[in-house]
Amino acid sequence: SKKALENDKNVIIEKPITANSKELEDLIETANKKNLMIFEAMNLHYTPAFLSLKEDLKKLGDIKIVSFNYSQYSSRYNTFKEGNILPAFDFHKAGGALMDLNVYNIHALIDLFGKY
C-alpha cells in the first residue's frame, strides 16, 4: 500500500487495513502529502440488509448486551495443524482469527453501537 501511494496511486486495501495504528497513521500521512485516497475494502456497512438493521435497532430502545460470532472452517487449517503457519494464521503478519474474521464483527459493532 505504501509503495502504491509513493507511486501516486489511490489505494483500496483489503482487511486488515494495517497491522497497527502506527502503520495506518503512516499511510494516512503519505496519502495526505500526495493528495491521494486510501480506502478500506470492507463494504458490509453499505449493504441493504445492514442499513436496514441499523435503522431497525433504533426502534428497540437501549441495547444492553450484544453477542457477535463469525467463524468458518479454513481450507488452510490442515496445513496449520502440520506446523506450517501461513500468513492468515500468523499474528506477526496481521493474521489470526481476530484480524482475519473478527475484524468484521468489530467493524459492525462500532458502526451499529459507536465507540466506547
How does the language model describe each region?
Residues 45-116:
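Predominantly a Rossmann-like dinucleotide-binding segment in NAD(P)-dependent oxidoreductases
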